[in-house]
């Protein structure tokens, strides 16, 4: 999940108390597939290839379109107003599943602070991009959990799905595919994505550490197989050096 840079150090209270809790239990979701050269599952010969320029000319994008991209996108493939379901990500936490150590946590600002910041906000991409910095040790983790909390507007959300693709210098490292399932209207939902990272070569770890923010990702969100949200992130692995 991605969010704006201004969210990274803030932990606000829930902004809409009428949101239903969604059951109070964290759903743990495992990716349906993992792709990437380092994982040994790089054979994607059955996937139709697409260029970003081709997709920008389409009125509706589906999962097979973004799965056919071979490099990170330069543009956002949908507009903020395409999120007609009012889906809003409010909290995000990354932890090492083997030790339970929290590696990163952000929360959306409370309503008052958000309104104040929006009054001076000029960047159309704000809210759709986040920059991460980790230590080199992060690249050696094998299992990571990403807990996300999000709210839903007045419409039911059918078949909510996320496809997240990670690249280093436009070389795809891994592709994750998660199903959130059905979300009831006016609900607050929490789930933990369970990432199983491929083992990276020592040379690739060195390059990714020495070249901060050249590792990037696209996160595509679909409802009923139609793209409604597109977030971006970049990563540095030189923290603590």
Swiss-Prot record:
Location of the region described as Disordered in the Swiss-Prot/TrEMBL record: 1-46
InterPro entries, A to Z: Ig_E-set, PDE6D_unc-119_myristoyl-bd, PDED_dom, PDED_dom_sf
Signal peptide: none
A GO molecular-function annotation: lipid binding
A GO CC term attached to the entry: ciliary transition zone
Superkingdom of the source species: Eukaryota
Location in the cell: Cell projection, Cilium
Keywords linked to the UniProt accession: Cell projection, Cilium, Cilium biogenesis/degradation, Lipid-binding, Protein transport, Transport
GO biological process, one term: nervous system development
Ligand binding (tetradecanoate): 132
Function: Myristoyl-binding protein that acts as a cargo adapter: specifically binds the myristoyl moiety of a subset of N-terminally myristoylated proteins and is required for their localization. Plays a key role in localization of proteins to the primary cilium membrane.
Domain characteristics, as noted in the entry: Adopts an immunoglobulin-like beta-sandwich fold forming a hydrophobic cavity that capture N-terminally myristoylated target peptides. Phe residues within the hydrophobic beta sandwich are required for myristate binding.
Family per record: Belongs to the PDE6D/unc-119 family.
Protein name as it appears in the record: Protein unc-119 homolog B-B
Naturally occurring in which organism (per UniProt): Xenopus laevis (African clawed frog)
Lineage of origin: Eukaryota, Metazoa, Chordata, Craniata, Vertebrata
Gene name linked to the record: unc119b-b
């Amino acid at each position: 999940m991605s969010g704006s840079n201004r969210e990274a150090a803030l932990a606000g209270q829930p902004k809409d108390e009428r949101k239903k809790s969604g059951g109070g239990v964290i759903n743990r979701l495992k990716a349906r597939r993992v792709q990437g050269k380092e994982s040994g599952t790089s054979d994607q010969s059955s996937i139709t290839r697409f260029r970003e320029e081709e997709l920008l000319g389409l009125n509706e994008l589906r999962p097979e379109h973004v799965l056919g991209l071979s490099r990170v996108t330069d543009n956002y493939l949908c507009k903020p107003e395409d999120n007609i379901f009012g889906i809003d990500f409010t909290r995000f936490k990354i932890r090492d599943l083997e030790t339970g150590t929290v590696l990163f946590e952000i929360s959306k600002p409370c309503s008052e602070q958000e309104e104040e910041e929006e009054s001076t906000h000029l960047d159309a991409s704000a809210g759709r991009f986040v920059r991460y910095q980790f230590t080199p040790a992060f690249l050696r983790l094998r299992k990571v959990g990403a807990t996300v909390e999000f709210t839903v507007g007045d419409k039911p959300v059918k078949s909510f799905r996320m496809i997240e693709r990670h690249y280093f210098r436009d070389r795809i490292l891994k592709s994750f595919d998660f199903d959130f399932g059905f979300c009831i209207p006016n609900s607050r939902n929490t789930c933990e994505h369970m990432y199983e990272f491929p083992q990276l070569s020592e040379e690739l770890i060195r390059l990714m550490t020495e070249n901060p923010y050249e590792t990037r990702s696209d996160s595509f969100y679909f409802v009923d197989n139609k793209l409604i949200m597109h977030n971006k992130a970049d990563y540095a692995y030189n923290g603590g050096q």
